Structures are given as structure tokens and as C-alpha cells.
Regions:
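Nucleotide-sugar donor-binding catalytic core of glycosyltransferases
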Residues: 4-7, 11-19, 57, 61-194, ...
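Non-catalytic N-terminal targeting/anchoring module and adjacent flexible stem/linker
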Residues: 273-281
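Short alpha-helix at the nucleotide-sugar/activated-sugar donor binding site of glycosyltransferases
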Residues: 197
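Short beta-strand/loop segments at the ligand-binding rim of alpha/beta enzyme cores
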Residues: 27-36
């Protein structure tokens, strides 16, 4: 319902924030704290800054953007990082083993934007030639050739799946791939990474400051095609006990530290409201 009603679209005036402004004004009249969380930082900071400026509290996935926010909104508005998390009701481990001895990737591929991210994807895909990779294309419904994946004999492209079904994919495939669009942030990482780990999946990811800080002990971080080929060359023979132990430890770690309950608690502390205990994460 909020699609095209939060970000700025200068060339599409019918896409505007009028409804959002009314909601924030109504909440403020009632003394309800107004909190904005930008999960699209730092790539799309400028598309959301106008909307963010309406709020009493601003959270961002990318800590690097905090000075930019402070420059715009001033000291009266609190700005803090708020990282991605998982919903355990959807993303959680299973005792069943994997069904497919391949890699999977759930997400998009773009020829016209995010060149660095695309290079990392192509490196991972090349490394998977020994085991094959199945892609679930987030942009399968878009007709533009800019969103088409490369034509590789070991890469199979399937239509997009609902977010709630991604968990089963991470459980079903032996390996799940991850790329991070933002690499220089200690708080920004792909949400996909924590969702893979929460499901007990074996994650193979590209590097980033946040990966090094939080996830390097629970995933394989590959930095070049040679490393990727060596890793997948081993994995084609199946998972080792160390692989399984690392995946299990990753699920335990994420579910202990990276759920939406944890993030809501951070928000409530920031606005000085008591946190009601609940079994729902």
C-alpha cells in the first residue's frame, strides 16, 4: 500500500509523499513518536531524505549515512543505525538435510546499475561451474533486458518466489550465495545473508566490513574467483562436518542476536518506551 509513497520521484509527480505527511502529522497531534527506518541506505539516501526529515527519530542500515542525516535534520532529531534482522517464524533451521547438491541465489542482477555488485555476482557464478547454481530471479516479472542474468550452461534461472518461500530454498540447497551492494559499512549487509544463516544454510558471501565484523566465523567469505573455484571444487563432494557445524553455529548466532525483536527493542530504547516481552520475534 505504501509503494511509491515514501521515496522521491522527481520525474513522476503522481508518486508523492502526501499521504505519508498526513499520517505523520496525525500521529504527532496525538503524541505518538514517529520513527523512520531507511533500509535502502546508503545507495538511495537522497531518494528518502525528504521523507525521513518528517520524523522524530531516524534509523538507517548504513552507519556511514548518519553524518549526512545530521547535516540535514540537525541535532533535534536522533539518528542511529539499525541493522537488518530475521523473523524466526519464517527463517529458522530445519533438521532435514539439503535436497539439492547445488548452489542457489535469490535476488536480482542488473546490467545498468551496481557495477561492483555485478562483478561480485559474476565471480561467484563462475566459481560455481563445478556444482551449478539455480537463481530465483527477483526481477523475473520485468521485461527490460537490463535485468537478465548471464547465459551460462551451469546457471538455471527460475521465476521469483514470495519472500516467505525463500527460507525453504536456503534449507533445500547445499549452498546459498550472497552478495553485498554496500561493502564499506560496518552495519550494512544484505538481509539475505542473515536469512540464509538463520535457516542453517551454508552461506558463501562476498566481503564487506560488516561481514568481517559479524559473520566471518559463520560463512565462507570469498574475495576472488580462485578462492571461489577452490571452495566449490571441494563442496562438489558434499559438506564436511566442519561445514555443518559452522552452519548450525550461524543459525544459533543469528537467532540470538539478529531478530526483529532485537531491533524493536533498540527502537523502543531510543524513544524511551518500555519493551513488552513477547514470544514472537
Amino acid at each position: 500500500a505504501w509503494k511509491y509513497k515514501i521515496a522521491a520521484y522527481p520525474d513522476r509527480p503522481e508518486r508523492n509523499t502526501q499521504t505519508l505527511r498526513k499520517v505523520v502529522a496525525s500521529a504527532r497531534e496525538r503524541g505518538i513518536p514517529c520513527v523512520f527506518w531507511n533500509r535502502e541506505d546508503g545507495i538511495h539516501f537522497h531518494r528518502f531524505i525528504s521523507s525521513a526529515s518528517l520524523f522524530d527519530y531516524i534509523f538507517t542500515v548504513d552507519q556511514n549515512c548518519i553524518p549526512q542525516y545530521q547535516e540535514v535534520v540537525g541535532p533535534a532529531v536522533a539518528v542511529a543505525p539499525l541493522m537488518f534482522a530475521v523473523q524466526p517464524a519464517i527463517h529458522s533451521p530445519s533438521t532435514d538435510g539439503y535436497r539439492y547438491p547445488q548452489a542457489c541465489f535469490v535476488g536480482s542482477y542488473s546490467l545498468h546499475v551496481h557495477g561492483g555488485r555485478r562483478n561480485w555476482q559474476e565471480m561467484l557464478f563462475a566459481g560455481c561451474s563445478d556444482i551449478g547454481v539455480t537463481v530465483y530471479d527477483r526481477n523475473s516479472g520485468r521485461s527490460s533486458p537490463n535485468y537478465r542474468y548471464p547465459d551460462l550452461p551451469w546457471l538455471q534461472v527460475c521465476p521469483s518466489v514470495p519472500h516467505t518461500q525463500t527460507a525453504q530454498l536456503y534449507r533445500d540447497y547445499m549452498v546459498s550465495l550472497n552478495v553485498n551492494t554496500v561493502e564499506d559499512s560496518v552495519t550494512m549487509f544484505s538481509r539475505r545473508l542473515v536469512e540464509i544463516l538463520a535457516c542453517g544454510g551454508l552461506a558463501v558471501t562476498t566481503p564487506g566490513l560488516s561481514v568481517d565484523r559479524y559473520f566471518k566465523d559463520y560463512s565462507y567469505v570469498v574475495r576472488c574467483e580462485e578462492e571461489a573455484r577452490d571452495l566449490f571444487g571441494r563442496l562438489k563432494h558434499g559438506l564436511t562436518s566442519r561445514d555443518r557445524e559452522m552452519a548450525a553455529a550461524g543459525a544459533e548466532y543469528v537467532l540470538k542476536e539478529f531478530t526483529w525483536t532485537h531491533r524493536l527493542e533498540e527502537v523502543m530504547r531510543a524513544i524511551s518506551r518500555p519493551v513488552k516481552q513477547s514470544s514472537v520475534a
